[in-house]
Regions:
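Long hydrophobic segments that form regular secondary structure
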Residues: 1, 59-108
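Amphipathic alpha-helical scaffolding segments comprising HEAT/armadillo-like alpha-solenoid repeats
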Residues: 57-65, 88-100, 119-131, 150-163
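Alpha-solenoid HEAT/ARM repeat scaffold
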Residues: 76-77, 106-109, 139-140, 157, ...
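Short, glycine-/Ser/Thr-/acidic-enriched flexible segments
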Residues: 6-8, 46-48, 118, 135, ...
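Alpha-helix N-cap/helix-start positions at coil->helix boundaries
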Residues: 73-74, 104-106, 135-136, 153, ...
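Beta-propeller domains with acidic blade repeats across secreted/periplasmic ectodomains
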Residues: 1-63, 74, 84-85, 155
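Structural signature of alpha-helical solenoid repeat scaffolds
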Residues: 84, 116, 146-147
Length: 174
């Protein structure tokens, strides 16, 4: 979407006090007169065919887990949010399998963060993720390990294997 606000300023009246420089400039150029004329354009390829509409509110938690692997990021985010809101812990084993064995790295990442949202990431799982080929997962696993280091600083030795990781995201998180 592209938004053409068709307006000189974005500020609301509360942010533009009378007597201020910006207030005088807005009045001088008439920027406050041009309101309610904005447009929103939806930009899409001429051959774009929309997919099926989601009906996630009517789906089971197990069905929502499948959406964590969806190619569309909105579907992944929405499924993750609904899973956590529901608090259905019966799907934790399925999430662990997706986090470690899923084909799509983004699906694995969403499964991992969903497990973390349930406070169900442990050192065993995270050490498996440290060897994942995708650097986003390795960096996320490091981040999830940090609270566990507060519990027992000896766990820091697990991170030594990542000290030479060539990817900058992993190095920065470490």
């Amino acid at each position: 979407y592209v938004v053409d606000m068709h307006r000189g300023v974005v500020q609301e009246a509360a942010w533009v006090p009378k007597g201020s420089f910006i207030h005088n400039a807005i009045k001088h150029y008439g920027l406050d007169q041009n309101v309610r004329r904005g447009r929103i354009y939806r930009v899409r390829h001429e051959n774009f065919e929309p997919g099926p509409l989601p009906k996630m509110l009517n789906e089971s938690s197990a069905q929502l887990v499948r959406h964590l692997d969806h190619p569309n990021g909105w579907w992944r985010d929405e499924a993750q949010k609904l899973i956590l809101i529901r608090g259905d812990r019966s799907i934790l084993p399925t999430l662990r399998i997706l986090a470690t064995e899923g084909e799509n790295p983004l699906g694995r990442l969403h499964a991992l963060w969903t497990l973390n949202g349930f406070d169900s990431t442990d050192l065993n799982l995270l050490s498996q993720i440290f060897t994942d080929p995708d650097p986003r997962l390795r960096a996320a696993a490091i981040r999830m390990t940090e609270p566990l280091l507060l519990e027992d600083p000896r766990n820091a030795s697990m991170l030594l294997s990542l000290a030479e990781d060539p990817h900058p995201d992993v190095s920065i998180q470490l």
